[in-house]
Protein backbone atom coordinates (compact mmCIF):
# COMPACT_ATOMS: atom_id res chain seq x y z
CA UNK A 1 0.00 0.00 0.00
CA UNK A 2 1.26 3.48 -0.85
CA UNK A 3 1.51 6.48 1.50
CA UNK A 4 -1.73 8.36 2.11
CA UNK A 5 -3.78 5.55 0.55
CA UNK A 6 -6.46 4.57 3.05
CA UNK A 7 -8.67 1.48 3.25
CA UNK A 8 -12.15 2.05 1.96
CA UNK A 9 -15.48 1.59 3.63
CA UNK A 10 -17.10 -0.35 0.83
CA UNK A 11 -18.29 -3.95 0.53
CA UNK A 12 -14.86 -5.48 1.12
CA UNK A 13 -14.50 -3.81 4.52
CA UNK A 14 -18.07 -4.68 5.47
CA UNK A 15 -17.32 -8.31 4.66
CA UNK A 16 -14.20 -8.26 6.83
CA UNK A 17 -16.17 -6.83 9.75
CA UNK A 18 -18.89 -9.45 9.33
CA UNK A 19 -16.30 -12.23 9.21
CA UNK A 20 -14.54 -10.94 12.33
CA UNK A 21 -17.82 -10.63 14.19
CA UNK A 22 -18.91 -14.12 13.18
CA UNK A 23 -15.57 -15.56 14.25
CA UNK A 24 -15.81 -13.88 17.63
CA UNK A 25 -19.34 -15.19 18.14
CA UNK A 26 -18.24 -18.79 17.70
CA UNK A 27 -15.15 -18.36 19.83
CA UNK A 28 -12.49 -18.32 17.10
CA UNK A 29 -9.65 -15.79 17.37
CA UNK A 30 -9.54 -12.99 14.81
CA UNK A 31 -7.32 -13.99 11.92
CA UNK A 32 -4.34 -11.80 11.04
CA UNK A 33 -4.65 -10.54 7.47
CA UNK A 34 -1.86 -8.93 5.48
CA UNK A 35 -4.12 -7.19 2.97
CA UNK A 36 -7.35 -5.39 2.16
CA UNK A 37 -8.99 -6.29 -1.11
CA UNK A 38 -9.20 -3.16 -3.23
CA UNK A 39 -11.12 -2.42 -6.38
CA UNK A 40 -9.09 -1.60 -9.45
CA UNK A 41 -8.88 -2.53 -13.09
CA UNK A 42 -5.81 -4.20 -14.51
CA UNK A 43 -4.60 -2.14 -17.46
CA UNK A 44 -3.74 -3.60 -20.85
CA UNK A 45 -0.04 -3.10 -20.20
CA UNK A 46 -0.24 -4.70 -16.77
CA UNK A 47 -2.14 -7.71 -18.13
CA UNK A 48 0.40 -8.10 -20.93
CA UNK A 49 3.18 -8.11 -18.35
CA UNK A 50 1.36 -10.78 -16.33
CA UNK A 51 0.85 -12.91 -19.44
CA UNK A 52 4.39 -12.53 -20.78
CA UNK A 53 6.50 -12.31 -17.63
CA UNK A 54 4.32 -14.17 -15.14
CA UNK A 55 5.62 -17.62 -16.14
CA UNK A 56 9.14 -16.58 -15.09
CA UNK A 57 8.58 -14.19 -12.18
CA UNK A 58 5.26 -15.27 -10.63
CA UNK A 59 5.54 -18.19 -8.22
CA UNK A 60 2.51 -20.27 -7.24
CA UNK A 61 1.49 -20.36 -3.61
CA UNK A 62 2.17 -23.77 -2.08
CA UNK A 63 1.92 -25.16 1.43
CA UNK A 64 5.54 -26.28 1.20
CA UNK A 65 8.92 -24.57 1.70
CA UNK A 66 10.08 -22.47 -1.23
CA UNK A 67 13.27 -23.59 -2.98
CA UNK A 68 14.87 -20.13 -3.23
CA UNK A 69 17.87 -21.30 -5.20
CA UNK A 70 15.70 -22.94 -7.84
CA UNK A 71 13.27 -20.00 -7.94
CA UNK A 72 16.01 -17.40 -8.44
CA UNK A 73 18.50 -19.53 -10.32
CA UNK A 74 21.48 -18.81 -8.08
CA UNK A 75 22.98 -19.51 -4.67
CA UNK A 76 24.39 -17.35 -1.91
CA UNK A 77 22.18 -14.25 -2.33
CA UNK A 78 20.58 -12.60 0.69
CA UNK A 79 16.85 -13.30 0.95
CA UNK A 80 14.50 -10.34 1.41
CA UNK A 81 10.75 -10.76 1.97
CA UNK A 82 8.42 -7.85 1.15
CA UNK A 83 4.82 -7.70 2.37
CA UNK A 84 2.47 -5.67 0.16
CA UNK A 85 4.42 -3.81 -2.53
CA UNK A 86 1.57 -1.66 -3.87
CA UNK A 87 2.30 -0.67 -7.46
CA UNK A 88 5.87 -1.93 -7.23
CA UNK A 89 7.92 1.23 -7.83
CA UNK A 90 9.77 0.97 -4.51
CA UNK A 91 10.37 -2.76 -4.94
CA UNK A 92 11.80 -2.28 -8.42
CA UNK A 93 14.05 0.57 -7.24
CA UNK A 94 15.47 -1.42 -4.33
CA UNK A 95 15.99 -4.56 -6.43
CA UNK A 96 17.95 -2.55 -9.00
CA UNK A 97 20.00 -0.90 -6.27
CA UNK A 98 20.82 -4.23 -4.62
CA UNK A 99 21.41 -6.74 -7.45
CA UNK A 100 23.18 -9.20 -5.17
CA UNK A 101 20.05 -9.69 -3.04
CA UNK A 102 16.98 -11.74 -3.96
CA UNK A 103 13.54 -10.23 -3.28
CA UNK A 104 10.30 -12.14 -2.78
CA UNK A 105 7.35 -9.75 -2.95
CA UNK A 106 3.86 -10.73 -1.84
CA UNK A 107 0.85 -8.78 -3.12
CA UNK A 108 -2.78 -9.79 -3.78
CA UNK A 109 -3.78 -6.70 -5.80
CA UNK A 110 -3.59 -7.78 -9.47
CA UNK A 111 -2.94 -4.29 -10.93
CA UNK A 112 0.00 -3.98 -8.51
CA UNK A 113 1.36 -7.37 -9.57
CA UNK A 114 1.06 -6.35 -13.21
CA UNK A 115 2.67 -2.97 -12.55
CA UNK A 116 5.72 -4.53 -10.89
CA UNK A 117 6.07 -7.11 -13.65
CA UNK A 118 5.92 -4.29 -16.19
CA UNK A 119 8.75 -2.48 -14.37
CA UNK A 120 10.74 -5.72 -14.21
CA UNK A 121 10.45 -6.06 -17.97
CA UNK A 122 11.22 -2.42 -18.74
CA UNK A 123 14.27 -2.27 -16.46
CA UNK A 124 15.63 -5.76 -17.00
CA UNK A 125 15.36 -6.72 -13.33
CA UNK A 126 16.14 -10.36 -12.60
CA UNK A 127 16.26 -10.64 -8.81
CA UNK A 128 12.55 -10.33 -7.96
CA UNK A 129 9.92 -13.04 -7.66
CA UNK A 130 6.24 -12.54 -6.75
CA UNK A 131 3.64 -14.62 -4.94
CA UNK A 132 0.08 -13.30 -5.28
CA UNK A 133 -1.36 -14.60 -2.02
CA UNK A 134 -1.90 -13.62 1.61
CA UNK A 135 1.56 -12.86 3.01
CA UNK A 136 0.67 -14.33 6.40
CA UNK A 137 0.08 -17.74 4.80
CA UNK A 138 3.10 -17.42 2.52
CA UNK A 139 5.30 -16.72 5.53
CA UNK A 140 3.85 -19.60 7.53
CA UNK A 141 3.89 -22.22 4.77
CA UNK A 142 6.64 -21.28 2.30
CA UNK A 143 9.34 -19.62 4.42
CA UNK A 144 11.14 -21.75 7.02
CA UNK A 145 12.10 -20.06 10.27
CA UNK A 146 15.56 -18.51 10.49
CA UNK A 147 16.06 -18.16 6.72
CA UNK A 148 15.37 -14.49 5.88
CA UNK A 149 18.00 -11.75 5.80
CA UNK A 150 15.46 -8.93 5.69
CA UNK A 151 11.75 -8.12 5.77
CA UNK A 152 10.14 -4.96 4.34
CA UNK A 153 6.70 -3.76 5.40
CA UNK A 154 6.20 -0.37 3.77
CA UNK A 155 3.04 1.68 4.34
CA UNK A 156 0.67 -1.05 5.51
CA UNK A 157 -2.98 -0.09 5.90
CA UNK A 158 -3.17 2.17 8.98
CA UNK A 159 -6.77 1.32 9.90
CA UNK A 160 -7.03 4.83 11.26
CA UNK A 161 -10.42 4.43 12.97
CA UNK A 162 -9.82 3.42 16.58
CA UNK A 163 -12.30 0.55 16.45
CA UNK A 164 -10.33 -0.88 13.51
CA UNK A 165 -6.85 -0.57 15.05
CA UNK A 166 -6.96 -4.26 15.98
CA UNK A 167 -6.76 -5.09 12.27
CA UNK A 168 -3.36 -3.50 11.86
CA UNK A 169 -0.71 -5.88 10.61
CA UNK A 170 2.10 -4.75 12.91
CA UNK A 171 1.02 -6.19 16.24
CA UNK A 172 2.85 -8.30 18.80
CA UNK A 173 1.90 -11.83 17.67
CA UNK A 174 2.71 -11.16 14.02
CA UNK A 175 5.98 -9.37 14.79
CA UNK A 176 6.99 -12.43 16.82
CA UNK A 177 6.35 -14.54 13.71
CA UNK A 178 8.40 -12.18 11.56
CA UNK A 179 11.28 -12.24 14.02
CA UNK A 180 11.25 -16.04 14.08
CA UNK A 181 11.73 -16.16 10.31
CA UNK A 182 14.78 -13.86 10.33
CA UNK A 183 18.31 -15.12 10.60
CA UNK A 184 20.35 -13.72 13.51
CA UNK A 185 21.45 -10.30 12.27
CA UNK A 186 18.57 -10.07 9.79
CA UNK A 187 16.53 -6.88 9.78
CA UNK A 188 12.87 -5.83 9.87
CA UNK A 189 12.15 -2.46 8.22
CA UNK A 190 8.70 -0.88 8.55
CA UNK A 191 7.57 2.52 7.29
CA UNK A 192 4.33 4.48 7.64
CA UNK A 193 2.98 7.98 7.06
CA UNK A 194 0.46 7.63 9.91
CA UNK A 195 2.09 9.04 13.06
CA UNK A 196 0.01 7.16 15.61
CA UNK A 197 0.68 3.88 13.79
CA UNK A 198 4.39 4.77 13.69
CA UNK A 199 4.48 5.00 17.47
CA UNK A 200 2.61 1.70 17.73
CA UNK A 201 5.16 0.08 15.41
CA UNK A 202 8.02 1.39 17.52
CA UNK A 203 6.38 0.18 20.72
CA UNK A 204 5.52 -3.28 19.37
CA UNK A 205 8.94 -3.92 17.82
CA UNK A 206 10.69 -2.67 20.97
CA UNK A 207 8.71 -5.19 23.02
CA UNK A 208 9.81 -8.17 20.90
CA UNK A 209 12.70 -9.84 22.78
CA UNK A 210 14.28 -11.27 19.62
CA UNK A 211 14.73 -7.80 18.10
CA UNK A 212 16.88 -4.77 18.88
CA UNK A 213 16.53 -1.25 17.51
CA UNK A 214 19.23 -0.07 15.11
CA UNK A 215 18.52 3.55 16.06
CA UNK A 216 17.56 5.57 19.11
CA UNK A 217 13.83 5.57 18.38
CA UNK A 218 12.79 6.14 14.77
CA UNK A 219 15.45 5.47 12.14
CA UNK A 220 16.62 7.83 9.42
CA UNK A 221 15.23 6.71 6.07
CA UNK A 222 17.72 4.14 4.74
CA UNK A 223 19.28 5.16 1.43
CA UNK A 224 17.83 2.13 -0.34
CA UNK A 225 14.21 3.14 0.34
CA UNK A 226 13.25 5.79 -2.23
CA UNK A 227 10.97 8.73 -1.55
CA UNK A 228 7.81 7.88 -3.52
CA UNK A 229 5.72 10.43 -5.39
CA UNK A 230 2.99 10.02 -2.77
CA UNK A 231 5.53 10.62 -0.02
CA UNK A 232 6.86 13.74 -1.75
CA UNK A 233 3.34 15.10 -2.03
CA UNK A 234 2.70 14.38 1.64
CA UNK A 235 5.94 16.04 2.71
CA UNK A 236 5.01 19.15 0.74
CA UNK A 237 1.74 19.21 2.68
CA UNK A 238 3.58 18.90 5.97
CA UNK A 239 2.90 15.21 6.55
CA UNK A 240 5.58 13.04 8.10
CA UNK A 241 6.95 9.60 7.27
CA UNK A 242 8.49 7.36 9.91
CA UNK A 243 10.88 4.42 9.49
CA UNK A 244 11.66 1.78 12.09
CA UNK A 245 14.52 -0.65 11.50
CA UNK A 246 15.16 -3.46 13.97
CA UNK A 247 17.68 -6.28 13.81
CA UNK A 248 17.41 -9.83 15.13
CA UNK A 249 19.68 -10.42 18.08
CA UNK A 250 22.52 -12.90 17.75
CA UNK A 251 21.61 -16.37 18.95
Swiss-Prot record:
Pathway named in the protein's UniProt entry: tRNA modification; N(7)-methylguanine-tRNA biosynthesis
Chain sites annotated for binding substrate: 161, 193, 228-231
Binding residue positions for S-adenosyl-L-methionine: 82, 107, 134, 157
GO (cellular component) term, any one: tRNA methyltransferase complex
EC identifiers of the protein: 2.1.1.33
Reactions the enzyme catalyzes: guanosine(46) in tRNA + S-adenosyl-L-methionine = N(7)-methylguanosine(46) in tRNA + S-adenosyl-L-homocysteine
Enzyme type, top EC level: transferase
Region (Disordered): 1-43
Residues annotated as the enzyme's active site: 157
UniProt superkingdom: Bacteria
CDD domains documented for this protein: AdoMet_MTases
Biased composition (Basic residues): 29-40
Keywords, comma-separated and alphabetical: Methyltransferase, S-adenosyl-L-methionine, Transferase, tRNA processing
UniProt cross-references to PROSITE patterns, sorted A to Z: SAM_MT_TRMB (PS51625)
Pfam families tied to this protein: Methyltransf_4
The UniProt record lists the keyword Transferase: yes
Interaction with RNA: region residues: 163-168
Gene Ontology MF terms in the entry: tRNA (guanine(46)-N7)-methyltransferase activity
Physiological role: Catalyzes the formation of N(7)-methylguanine at position 46 (m7G46) in tRNA.
Family membership: Belongs to the class I-like SAM-binding methyltransferase superfamily. TrmB family.
NCBIfam families the UniProt entry points to: tRNA (guanosine(46)-N7)-methyltransferase TrmB
Protein name: tRNA (guanine-N(7)-)-methyltransferase
Species of origin: Ralstonia nicotianae (strain ATCC BAA-1114 / GMI1000)
Amino acid sequence: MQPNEQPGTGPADTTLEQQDTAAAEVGHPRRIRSFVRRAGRTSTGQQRAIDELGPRFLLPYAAAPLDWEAAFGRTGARRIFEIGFGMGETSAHIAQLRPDDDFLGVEVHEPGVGALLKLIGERGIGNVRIVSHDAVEVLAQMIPEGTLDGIHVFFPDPWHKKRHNKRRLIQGPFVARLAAHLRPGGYLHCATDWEEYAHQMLEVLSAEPLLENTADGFAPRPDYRPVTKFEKRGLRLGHGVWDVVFRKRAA
